Regions:
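Enzyme catalytic cores with a strong preference for nitrogen-chemistry domains
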Residues: 1-284, 289-295
Length: 295
């Protein structure tokens, strides 16, 4: 049997720019299709950007997201896509991920674990889902989790019990120093508990005070890293799954800590200016260490 080819789409979304985000997802889907992928996975809430905050208190925003999702499904009919988006369903609101296939929305997963600490306040906006979602692509059963779902036991186990052979994790995981090592540790715990290989698609870009570093990756059922996308830039990688195993692929080189922090600062400032439409910036130099770092 030919391998299942899954594209990890490391996308830089802008909060509230539904048209621009959908266009970017469609562009990545075209690239993934051209590379022979059967399925593409986006980051968490890629359609609306993360964190959308009080936009999620507006019913018209959910309606606009639903229209954008339907239009995106029509634009990506030549490849299956799992896309993160907010959803209004039966009077409740969810952090969701849907499978788009053949021009339609055919399945939806609703995030189980809603973080409510530090920069996260998802319980303010969303209800928690409770059902697993397992989709079949090229004969392979893929479970879906969203970000915090893989940081605790429960949701990944439910996907495994529902028959998943591998796990697709959509994420909007902000950067801090040593964060990637923590992600590896957490995902290896889920892999050890479930026996499922994991494909981890993370958001990249600056949004207000947050920086998302991307660094998406794939791990096999032994917890070995098979693919690693770069930090702080958009990227697309094709992961092959055959015979119950992930095939080894490209692993981006790691940076020194100093280079990593520098790239995070550059990306955060660049996107803060660009996404807010500022024409430039005035830099006030006091002579302290903050001024030296800015220069």
């Amino acid at each position: 049997m030919s391998p299942l080819r899954i594209a990890l789409a490391q996308i830089n979304s802008t909060v509230g720019d539904l048209e621009g985000n959908a266009r970017r997802i469609a562009e990545f889907a075209e690239r993934a299709h051209a590379a022979g992928a059967h399925l593409m996975v986006t980051p968490e809430l890629a359609l609306c950007g993360y964190p959308p905050e009080d936009l999620l208190l507006r019913p018209d925003f959910y309606r606009a997201c639903a229209r954008s999702l339907d239009a995106l499904a029509a634009r990506t009919a030549n490849i299956a896509v799992v896309v993160g988006h907010p959803e209004q369903y039966r009077g409740d609101y969810f952090n969701a991920a849907s499978l788009l296939r053949d021009g339609k929305v055919v399945a939806t997963y609703r995030k189980h674990r809603l973080p409510n600490y530090e920069v996260f306040d998802e319980q303010r906006y969303f209800s928690a889902g409770y059902q697993p979602c397992v989709i079949e692509v090229q004969g392979v059963r893929c479970g879906i989790n969203i970000c915090a779902d893989v940081w605790e036991p429960g949701a990944a186990d439910a996907a495994m019990q529902a028959g998943a052979e591998l796990l697709l994790a959509l994420n909007a995981s902000p950067y801090h120093m040593t964060k990637q090592a923590t992600r590896y540790e957490v995902l290896r715990e889920r892999i050890q508990a479930t026996g499922l290989p994991v494909l981890y698609a993370n958001l990249v870009g600056g949004q207000d005070e947050l920086v998302f570093d991307g660094a998406s990756f794939a791990m096999d059922r032994e917890g070995r890293l098979t693919h690693q996308l770069p930090q702080f830039s958009e990227a697309l990688a094709i992961v092959e799954y055959a015979g119950g195993e992930l095939r080894a692929g490209a692993v981006a080189p790691s940076r020194t800590l100093e280079a990593e922090v520098y790239e995070a600062l550059v990306l955060g400032v660049r996107d803060y200016l660009g996404k807010n439409g500022f024409p430039g910036a005035i830099i006030g130099l006091s002579g302290g260490i903050d001024s030296a770092l800015t220069l």
